[in-house]
């Protein structure tokens, strides 16, 4: 949600073209059975901001099913800021009765009946980013309320938090959620401003690494670069979060949106759609439901990909190891002109010899290649391939 946050220093490695070599950090992530793969779903904020309602959520749940997104893996339907208006005399948080006349419990029941999961938003401070009541000093009460409503996912923001310590506040809310006995995913949203990659594992299931994404090529790449710096801490039970998807919101071309989606897949990032699912184009739906690309993101190995090579400014090879021994490789052209990019077996960790190459956006086998695979990539685009060593 909109805020002013201190920026983390941009990745100097990218500026000078050095690859990021992953390290094997010993990270204690949560082992509660939740978020064993990156969470997938939909959130109101990017498209609708404060314009949220019961009708929107029901129609979106319907669209998740009708579009094939639910069956492709999208499960969480999340209401972001502005659903809440005040606390009653007992301190219980109250949903806007005009926008949610049936109440949140009934809405969660509707979402659950569609085979989906239900999420909600709060803030660790006194008020949310849009001035609604925050959860400060009501952590246990709010956790109990959400559990009683049937909430499966909570995004917790960091506005109006002056004087608070992020690790302590998020840990307190995590413990309150655990105490309810209901399995609830906790999404930590403090924009990467308190080094959540250090304390987020073991506290939440995902943690934002950046400020809010905008629906532009430049913003998407900025969030990619900042998130790539923390590759070692991500894995089953805890994920770096470069923010929600902008696919389908109109600020980028379809080729740029394919790159956005492919790179979030390589990053093992949460895939939270942020567009209007009721009116999306066929091209948008095809991006969001490409099961071969989703499979890269949801791979059971749970390794976040990294920048393997940058042979020239703006030309990058990103790689993600997969559980079956293959590699997903994104050949990314950030430059202003079409260029040839090459996936070199040595750089991406594939044994010398022949390997099969499949183009995941084209859904086409490209053949068997020895040592490397080269392809021309348009400006502001990606070619995403799966490279499988010959057995």
Outline where the language-model segments fall.
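Bacterial N-terminal signal peptides
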Residues: 8-19
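Structural recognition of the beta-strand scaffold that forms the well-ordered cores
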Residues: 38-44, 73-80, 117-122, 152-157, ...
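Aromatic-lined carbohydrate-binding/catalytic grooves of carbohydrate-active enzymes
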Residues: 60, 64-163
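Catalytic cores of secreted or luminal carbohydrate-active enzymes
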Residues: 259-308
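Carbohydrate-binding surface patches
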Residues: 264-267, 272-274, 310-350, 380
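C-terminal beta-strand-rich structural cap/linker in extracellular carbohydrate-active enzymes
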Residues: 368-391
